[in-house]
Amino acid sequence: TKAQLARWVDYANQKGAVIIYDAAYEAYISQEDVPHSIYECEGARTCAIELRSFSKNAGFTGLRLGYTVVPKDLKVNDVSLHSLWARRHGTKYNGAPYIVQRAGEAVYSAKGEAQLKQQIAYYMKNAACILQGLRDAGYRVSGGVNAPYIWLETPKGMGSWQFFDELLENAGVAGTPGAGFGPNGEGYFRLTAFGSYE
């Protein structure tokens, strides 16, 4: 929620820490109390960098188009991170290919925005269906509300890779074993709503 995120912003400002905030799924947010940007929180411009991607909202996975917001107010030890980022980026990065830039431009056209809203609504309908189906089948689940991913606890203490094999072999369903996200992901499994409703 915005209140929870605001507490992190306050903490970062008190400790002199920098938050790197991944807003890749911003377009999927539907709940009013969940911010679309960390900069909706007072004080975030002095402690946060926000990452934005076209991969999740516009299906640009593999094309690598996104942007980073580094506020001019963000300083560490009195050094502007905005200036350092601009210098680094201007020296090391030559920009996205022209055709990818044009595709990114199309995302912000009236037609592009309408198509993306329609596509996101479709994926979220899928997420709601998967979420309810898993609940009805007795699984402990979460997610599928402000992002197109549904997490479930693997049954009977089964390892996430073992559950992956079982689902693939017996149901023809592929997903992502939680162990792939690190040791705390073990015992969980992630399904995606990026598919056809049927």
Q: Locations of the language-model features?
A:
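PLP-dependent class I/II
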Residues: 1-198
